[in-house]
Amino acid sequence: MAAACTRTLGKVGRLVLDTPTCRFTNTAAFVPRTSMRCQGRAYGTGSSGFKSRLLLAAPVRGSGRVLGCAFLLGGGFGLYQTIKLTLQHHLAEKESDASDLDTDLKLTLYQYKTCPFCSKVRAFLDYHRLPYEIVEVNPVMRQEIKWSTYRKVPILMVNGTVQLNDSSVIISALKTYISSKDKKISEILACYPEMKSKNDRGKDVIEFGNKYWVMVHDADADQLYPGKDSRKEEIKWRTWADDWLVHLISPNVYRTPTEALASFDYIVREGKFGSFEGFFAKYFGAAAMWIISKRLKYKHNLQADVRQDLYKAVNDWVAAIGKNKQFMGGDEPNLADLAVFGVLRVMEGLQSFDDMMEHTKVKKWYSRMQKATQHVS
């Protein structure tokens, strides 16, 4: 959760530095997404131990300034080791395997590995066996994309010259290219115009027109969408994945102090912290994420137990597929299948993922999607 941790820990530190005292109470909380463009996450499950729970459950009193410094110090240690671990994983990453498609595209994906939007793009590329290189972006400095005026991930570079932004635009544009075969990527990109505006807080925002549409001729559309409402349903559920499902990930991953600690415990363990560094990174880092994230539950009007929102969303998706189809797309996954799978996949290895598999009907569909998107080695 490097990107979210960076901004969240900074906010917590400044907040606590300006606050006379700070008190923790043992209530559930949720982690905020970072502009909903990239939410990474820390991995790992399992009990954090009785002492761990006591440290978060017990009230903390004292100088707000000292505690704020502790948050920043712990966050800094944790962030450094997280970035180092991410870079180690990146060095071990290989280019994806050969394509089943006759295409001369050279694709480079700039990403955070645990971002659900980046995961969506990888699911699409893997399913279509499109070879691509990965550049893991440093979530703090983002030096890897300093050349880009667009500062969010994923970014996909095509043949080193054409830049595609926004996960849904990337997927729609590439699907158009694969399906039409008579247009250049640069020509297709013009179908998804960038629109700049300001939100109600006066912040600049960027959206993209037509981003859920695959731009093909009628004859190609009939082949691509054989069902009466298949195109409409694909767009509906792709939009749902971006506008609702992705909002449920962070609240469930960091639902309780124990789950937050379990996630940070993984980072500390894999990052080979010293005992002092590990203490601050694990306990203060997890506490910071836990406290700040409380607002997310109210912002998105979630239930007291956010697992129930996740279960309902996933079961709604399975019900929409129906009993007589393997995928939303029928016998093969469509873009909605790939989007939903990409979002849910970032919870793998966490308690929230295990609970979802146990308490919903998604397991069979998810298993089929795993097989469909596997790399060919």
Curated annotation (Swiss-Prot):
Activation/inhibition comment: Isomerase activity is increased by sulfhydril compounds. Dithiothreitol (DTT) is most effective, followed by glutathione (GSH) and 2-mercaptoethanol.
CDD domains found in the cross-reference section: GST_C_mPGES2 (cd03197), GST_N_mPGES2 (cd03040)
Entry's EC annotation: 5.3.99.3
Domain GST N-terminal: 105-182
Ranges of residues in domain GST C-terminal: 266-377
Any one GO MF annotation of this record: lyase activity
Membrane topology of the entry: Single-pass membrane protein
Pathway listed: Lipid metabolism; prostaglandin biosynthesis
Domain of life: Eukaryota
GO BP annotation list: prostaglandin biosynthetic process
Chain segments annotated as transmembrane: 66-83
Class of the enzyme per the UniProt entry, highest EC level: isomerase
Binding site for glutathione: 153, 166-167
Xref: PROSITE patterns: GLUTAREDOXIN_1 (PS00195), GLUTAREDOXIN_2 (PS51354), GST_CTER (PS50405)
Gene Ontology cellular component terms for the protein in this record: Golgi membrane; mitochondrion
Gene3D superfamilies named among the record's database cross-references: 1.20.1050.10, 6.20.200.30, Glutaredoxin
Annotated catalysed reactions: prostaglandin H2 = prostaglandin E2; prostaglandin H2 = (12S)-hydroxy-(5Z,8E,10E)-heptadecatrienoate + malonaldehyde
Annotated signal peptide: none
Compartment(s): Golgi apparatus membrane
Lumenal topological segments: 1-65
Keyword terms, alphabetized: Fatty acid biosynthesis, Fatty acid metabolism, Golgi apparatus, Isomerase, Lipid biosynthesis, Lipid metabolism, Membrane, Prostaglandin biosynthesis, Prostaglandin metabolism, Transmembrane, Transmembrane helix
Family stated for the protein in its record: Belongs to the GST superfamily.
Subunit description: Homodimer.
Function: Isomerase that catalyzes the conversion of PGH2 into the more stable prostaglandin E2 (PGE2) (in vitro). The biological function and the GSH-dependent property of PTGES2 is still under debate. In vivo, PTGES2 could form a complex with GSH and heme and would not participate in PGE2 synthesis but would catalyze the degradation of prostaglandin E2 H2 (PGH2) to 12(S)-hydroxy-5(Z),8(E),10(E)-heptadecatrienoic acid (HHT) and malondialdehyde (MDA).
Protein name per UniProt: Prostaglandin E synthase 2
Source species: Danio rerio (Zebrafish)
